[in-house]
């Protein structure tokens, strides 16, 4: 395999990490006490030329876990009725098991070492995901325990915007505010944004890294 072909592998792009775009809608801000209401993930792949694309999607409405807190301000914001039977909600455990099975399979296929959360304001989603995994007592957690790719931070660097809708528009993507705060829609837009950020860096010549050239300018600053 040539050097360029090696650089075009997903496993070599992010230090063997398998990026999984995720958005979680919740009934509050406390990952340990407040209910997860909706979760969506999108896995990613790289084509033969090293361009990043969306791959598969999972989306679940979640039943509030026993004893969880439902904050009225949170559900007024995301407009989710946790107890509406038409949501077709499933248990948190079944949803998390399905997600982790998908991630483990992707890690294996892509030759990666572990999953890494990609999210907008990623600390929030990562905290809720880790709390849910612990709550349902799954020991083999494929995700990195603290590292994430935060598209809010990356967008602030690249286009000077940190709000998801503004970042998407600044980078040339459409955004429908009426669909915002749906886990499925926000995950889709975050995935589009992350792919464009990564691919734009490649188009500008930032990837693959020229280590020799970078070492020669290492004392510039």
Swiss-Prot record:
Mg(2+) 1 binds at residue 23. This is Ribonuclease T. Trims short 3' overhangs of a variety of RNA species, leaving a one or two nucleotide 3' overhang. Responsible for the end-turnover of tRNA: specifically removes the terminal AMP residue from uncharged tRNA (tRNA-C-C-A). Also appears to be involved in tRNA biosynthesis. Belongs to the RNase T family. It is an enzyme of class 3 (hydrolase). Gene3D superfamilies: Ribonuclease H-like superfamily/Ribonuclease H (3.30.420.10). It comes from Buchnera aphidicola subsp. Acyrthosiphon pisum (strain APS) (Acyrthosiphon pisum symbiotic bacterium). Its cofactor is Mg(2+). Binds two Mg(2+) per subunit. The active form of the enzyme binds two Mg(2+) ions in its active site. The first Mg(2+) forms only one salt bridge with the protein. Keywords: Exonuclease, Hydrolase, Magnesium, Metal-binding, Nuclease, tRNA processing. One of its GO terms (molecular function) is magnesium ion binding. Its EC number is 3.1.13.-. Homodimer. Residues 20-194 form the Exonuclease domain. Pfam families: RNase_T. The record marks 29, 77, 124, 146 as: Important for substrate binding and specificity. PANTHER family: DNA POLYMERASE III SUBUNIT EPSILON, RIBONUCLEASE T. The gene is rnt. Coiled coil: none annotated.
């Amino acid at each position: 395999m040539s050097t360029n072909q090696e650089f075009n592998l997903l496993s070599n792009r992010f230090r063997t990490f398998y990026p999984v775009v995720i958005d979680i809608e919740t009934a509050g801000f406390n990952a340990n006490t407040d209910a997860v209401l909706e979760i969506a993930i999108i896995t990613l792949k790289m084509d033969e030329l090293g361009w990043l694309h969306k791959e598969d999607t999972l989306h679940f409405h979640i039943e509030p876990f026993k004893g969880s807190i439902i904050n009225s301000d949170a559900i007024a914001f995301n407009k989710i009725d946790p107890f509406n039977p038409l949501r077709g909600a499933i248990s948190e455990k079944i949803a998390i098991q399905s997600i982790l099975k998908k991630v483990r399979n992707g890690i294996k296929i892509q030759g990666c070492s572990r999953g890494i959360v990609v999210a907008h304001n990623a600390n929030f989603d990562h905290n809720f995901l880790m709390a849910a995994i612990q709550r349902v007592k799954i020991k083999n957690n494929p995700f990195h325990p603290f590292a994430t790719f935060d598209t809010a931070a990356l967008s602030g660097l690249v286009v000077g915007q940190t709000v998801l809708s503004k970042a998407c528009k600044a980078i040339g993507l459409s955004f429908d505010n009426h669909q915002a705060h749906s886990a499925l829609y926000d995950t889709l837009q975050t995935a589009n944004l992350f792919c464009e950020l990564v691919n734009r860096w490649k188009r500008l010549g930032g990837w693959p890294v020229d280590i020799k050239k970078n070492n020669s300018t290492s004392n510039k600053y």
